[in-house]
Amino acid sequence: MYAARAQHIDQVILPALNAGKTVLCDRFTDASFAYQCAGRGLSEAKLQLLNDSFVSRMPDLTFWLDAPIELGMNRARARGALDRFEQEKAAFFEKVRAGYQALSERHPERVKRLDAAQTPEQVFAQALQYF
């Protein structure tokens, strides 16, 4: 996972940033913290070691798309085939959500909570407030 992330940074993210473009990723280091540390119990020290070793550029801004767990699970089921994370129980997602909450408290200048219970258009409008 981290070798692919390092390659993605070097071949996609950094060239785009150097060209003056804005880069949006659907998952990155904060998702790794929420899912692997908060959700699965990986130690933060191990994750930090991986980030220090493989991640040459940390995000300037993270949007945390927060919605009630049951709503998120219903949306995933409505899309069809569930991936391995989407097959987890609600208790796992409560831990992940708590992880994102902890990140937003630890880095309030960078991690922004968006109310994802709203329509996609409303969520997009929330995100635009930070640009």
Name these PLM-found stretches.
Residues 25-27, 48, 55-77:
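Conserved phosphate-donor/acceptor-positioning beta-strand/loop module used by diverse small-molecule
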Residues 38-40, 59, 90, 97-98:
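Short capping/connector residues at structural and topological boundaries
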Residues 1-55:
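ATP-dependent small-molecule kinase phosphotransfer cores
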Residues 70-131:
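NTP-dependent small-molecule kinase module
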Residues 35, 67, 116:
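Short, conserved catalytic or interaction motifs in soluble domains
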